[in-house]
């Protein structure tokens, strides 16, 4: 009677199971990442963070909430470029205050303890969602803002702040949201200088996609976050005067009286 052959034992035993399990974990993480970035929204990003914490026992660092740059204006670069942006037909000078105000519909003036903030949607100011070129139709409105600033006390400091949403900057010349926001704030500041605002009163900041005022989960909210803010700050003695002047100038009901 023939002897039964004993089953061949693997000399490595079950050592293959450990790297195989690691491989499956990495593969799972990859598919989770691909799924999340296919349609980015806040809930999916949070789910992705949770899965990475579970798989790798790693907690992602929170985004910085401080501006990347606060830069006072330089001497005279891009003067010719900004001059071409500010050029407009003479017929536009006959437009009434009400017409100019309509160009700024969508802007919001808020009074705060430190001063006032004028919020301007980027969709109003710039040619498209990833551009830093100011819309020519908005030049008269920015000129009006400059004239209002010139009525304020010289002690008032104006900081032009750029913000974006979190939409990926694919196929653009900007390497980051900070760069896009900085360029936009700088452009608005240069136009204000072009229209007579004292450069010593001005600076600009870039916050990139940080400090959103609404969740980036819809087109409407992303449009709110994609903005330029003009922040007026001064000491307590001038606050009431600033509030009064800005409220009178930017309140459409008072303009019609």
Curated annotation (Swiss-Prot):
InterPro entries: Bact_OuterMem_StrucFunc, MotB-like_N_dom, OmpA-like, OmpA-like_sf
Cysteine-cysteine disulfides: none
Cytoplasmic-side segments: 1-16
Membrane topology: Single-pass type II membrane protein
Keyword Transmembrane helix in annotation: yes
Domain OmpA-like per the UniProt entry, residue ranges: 113-236
Keyword terms, alphabetized: Cell inner membrane, Cell membrane, Chemotaxis, Flagellar rotation, Membrane, Transmembrane, Transmembrane helix
Main subcellular location of this protein, as a coarse class: membrane
GO BP, one annotated term: archaeal or bacterial-type flagellum-dependent cell motility
Location in the cell: Cell inner membrane
Gene3D superfamilies registered for this protein in UniProt: OmpA-like domain
Segments passing through the bilayer: 17-37
Pfam name, any one: OmpA
GO CC annotation: plasma membrane
CDD domains: OmpA_C-like (cd07185)
Residue intervals annotated with topology Periplasmic: 38-257
Bias kind Polar residues: ranges: 83-97
Disordered: annotated span: 74-100
Subunit structure: Each stator complex is composed of 4 MotA and 2 MotB subunits. 2 A subunits and 1 B subunit are thought to form a single ion channel, so that each stator complex contains two channels.
Record-linked NCBIfam families: PRK08457.1
Family: Belongs to the MotB family.
Function description: MotA and MotB comprise the stator element of the flagellar motor complex. Required for the rotation of the flagellar motor. Might be a linker that fastens the torque-generating machinery to the cell wall.
Descriptive protein name: Motility protein B
Organism: Helicobacter pylori (strain J99 / ATCC 700824) (Campylobacter pylori J99)
